[in-house]
């Protein structure tokens, strides 16, 4: 490792530091200690999550553990929920300029996802002191809570 950056903070820097291709990286989950699958490594990288260092070894997080950790974080550290105008008033920063993650999968929200939350009059959630929302992938589906259709023949 280089002296100026002894512990790479993300998957891409870790690969560069050790001369590895992303698909060749083998890393364990910080929670369950199992090896991350190729899909888990890619998802961890795309979500721009930080590598955790323990006793000189890097760890990531598998998808299953990330979802469980997110749910636990919601239960333990949820402060309150409010609409976008309240978030902007509280922070003094327009929603599109705020860094936010999905409170379900941890993916950084893009401006289209933030805009969809604003236009849809959906709430943002303050969890562990950070403003969060849900990404398009984790958004409730429009028919998810609809009553089942009965068909007659």
UniProtKB/Swiss-Prot annotation:
<dbReference type="GO" id="GO:0042025">
    <property type="term" value="C:host cell nucleus"/>
</dbReference>
<keyword id="KW-0010">Activator</keyword>
<comment type="function">
    <text>Plays a major role in the induction and maintenance of cellular transformation. E6 associates with host UBE3A/E6-AP ubiquitin-protein ligase and modulates its activity. Sequesters tumor suppressor TP53 in the host cytoplasm and modulates its activity by interacting with host EP300 that results in the reduction of TP53 acetylation and activation. In turn, apoptosis induced by DNA damage is inhibited. E6 also protects host keratinocytes from apoptosis by mediating the degradation of host BAK1. May also inhibit host immune response.</text>
</comment>
<feature type="zinc finger region">
    <location>
        <begin position="102"/>
        <end position="138"/>
    </location>
</feature>
<keyword id="KW-0899">Viral immunoevasion</keyword>
<comment type="subunit">
    <text>Forms homodimers. Interacts with ubiquitin-protein ligase UBE3A/E6-AP; this interaction stimulates UBE3A ubiquitin activity. Interacts with host TP53 and EP300; this interaction inhibits TP53 activity.</text>
</comment>
<keyword id="KW-0479">Metal-binding</keyword>
<keyword id="KW-0804">Transcription</keyword>
<feature type="zinc finger region">
    <location>
        <begin position="29"/>
        <end position="65"/>
    </location>
</feature>
<comment type="similarity">
    <text>Belongs to the papillomaviridae E6 protein family.</text>
</comment>
<dbReference type="GO" id="GO:0039648">
    <property type="term" value="P:symbiont-mediated perturbation of host ubiquitin-like protein modification"/>
</dbReference>
<dbReference type="GO" id="GO:0003677">
    <property type="term" value="F:DNA binding"/>
</dbReference>
<dbReference type="GO" id="GO:0006351">
    <property type="term" value="P:DNA-templated transcription"/>
</dbReference>
<dbReference type="GO" id="GO:0039502">
    <property type="term" value="P:symbiont-mediated suppression of host type I interferon-mediated signaling pathway"/>
</dbReference>
<dbReference type="GO" id="GO:0052170">
    <property type="term" value="P:symbiont-mediated suppression of host innate immune response"/>
</dbReference>
<dbReference type="GO" id="GO:0008270">
    <property type="term" value="F:zinc ion binding"/>
</dbReference>
<dbReference type="GO" id="GO:0052150">
    <property type="term" value="P:symbiont-mediated perturbation of host apoptosis"/>
</dbReference>
<keyword id="KW-0863">Zinc-finger</keyword>
<keyword id="KW-1048">Host nucleus</keyword>
<keyword id="KW-1090">Inhibition of host innate immune response by virus</keyword>
<dbReference type="GO" id="GO:0006355">
    <property type="term" value="P:regulation of DNA-templated transcription"/>
</dbReference>
<keyword id="KW-1035">Host cytoplasm</keyword>
<dbReference type="Pfam" id="PF00518">
    <property type="entry name" value="E6"/>
</dbReference>
<dbReference type="InterPro" id="IPR001334">
    <property type="entry name" value="E6"/>
</dbReference>
<keyword id="KW-0805">Transcription regulation</keyword>
<dbReference type="InterPro" id="IPR038575">
    <property type="entry name" value="E6_sf"/>
</dbReference>
<protein>
    <recommendedName>
        <fullName>Protein E6</fullName>
    </recommendedName>
</protein>
<keyword id="KW-1119">Modulation of host cell apoptosis by virus</keyword>
<dbReference type="GO" id="GO:0030430">
    <property type="term" value="C:host cell cytoplasm"/>
</dbReference>
<keyword id="KW-0238">DNA-binding</keyword>
<keyword id="KW-0862">Zinc</keyword>
<keyword id="KW-0244">Early protein</keyword>
<keyword id="KW-0945">Host-virus interaction</keyword>
């Amino acid at each position: 490792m280089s002296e100026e950056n002894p512990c790479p903070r993300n998957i891409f820097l870790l690969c560069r530091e050790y001369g590895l291709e992303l698909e060749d990286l083998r890393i364990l989950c910080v929670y369950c200690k199992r090896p991350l699958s190729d899909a888990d490594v890619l998802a961890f990288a795309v979500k721009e999550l930080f590598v955790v260092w323990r006793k000189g070894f890097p760890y990531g997080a598998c998808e299953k553990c990330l979802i469980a950790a997110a749910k636990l974080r919601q239960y333990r550290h949820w402060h309150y929920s409010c609409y976008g105008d309240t978030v902007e008033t509280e922070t003094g920063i327009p929603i599109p300029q705020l860094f936010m993650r999905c409170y379900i999968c941890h993916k950084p929200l893009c401006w289209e996802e933030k805009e969809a939350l604003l236009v849809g009059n959906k709430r943002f959630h303050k969890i562990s002191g950070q403003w969060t929302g849900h990404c398009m992938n984790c958004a409730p589906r429009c028919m998810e809570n609809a009553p089942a259709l009965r068909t007659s023949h």
